[in-house]
Amino acid sequence: MIKLVAFDWNGTLLSDTAITLRSENAALKAVGREPITLLQFQKAFDIPITKYWKNLGMTENFFKKHLLTIEDVFHSIYEKNVNAARTRSGAKGVLKFLRQSKITMVIYSNHNIPNIHRQLVRLNIDGLFDRILANKKAGENAHVFARHKEHLLNEFIKQKKYKPHEVISVGDTEEEIQIGKTYGYYTVAITGGYNTTIRLA
C-alpha cells in the first residue's frame, strides 16, 4: 500500500522548463557561451550542476571561475519570470485525489523552501503538502556540487518509518528515477520536463 508520494518540483509539478531554458541561456551569454536549444538542455541537464555544465563542454575551472555570475544571472531571470508558470497539466487533479485518499505528499527539491512555498500559495496548492524538503533559504546551492535532496527524503522516510515499497518518487529527471531505484521506491517519470524521454527509461 502506498503511503507517501514524493514529488520533484521544477519541471514536475511546476511547468517551468521554458523559463529555466531562457534563464540558462542568459547565464550562458553572460559568460561568453552560445545559447542552447531545449533538446540540448534536456540531454545535458543533470545534478550536481557541475556535471550539467561539463556536459555542455565546460571545464571545472571555467565553471568555478564564473559560478557567481552564472548563479546570479540565472536566478535573476528565473525569478522575474516564474510567476508566469502554471502547474503541469493534470497535476492539481492528481494532488487532490491523493489528498482525498489520505496519502502523505511531500516536495523534495534542489530549489529552496521560501520560493517553492511562494509559488504553492500563488497556485493555490499550498495546503496539499505535508512537507517541503529543500534548501532552507534562497542562495543555498548544495546541489551545484553534489546530490543532496535524496538525503532529505530518506531522513523524512526514516522519521515516519515508511518502508521502501510504500513510497513513490515522481520526477522529470534521471535524479528522481535513480533515487527510487537505489532505495527501492516505486518511480513515476514525467516527460516534457528537464530531461529527454529516453533518459527516463
Where in the sequence are the language-model features?
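N-terminal helical cap/lid subdomain that shapes the substrate entry/recognition surface
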Residues: 2-93, 97
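Acidic di-acidic motifs
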Residues: 15, 171-172
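Substrate-recognition "cap/lid" segment bordering the active-site pocket of phosphatases
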Residues: 84, 113-168, 174-183, 197-198
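Substrate-recognition element of Asp-dependent hydrolases with the DxDx(T/V) motif
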Residues: 91-121, 132-135
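Anion (oxyanion) recognition and catalysis
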Residues: 99, 181, 201
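Short, glycine/polar-rich helix-capping loops at beta-to-alpha or helix-loop-helix junctions
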Residues: 192-201
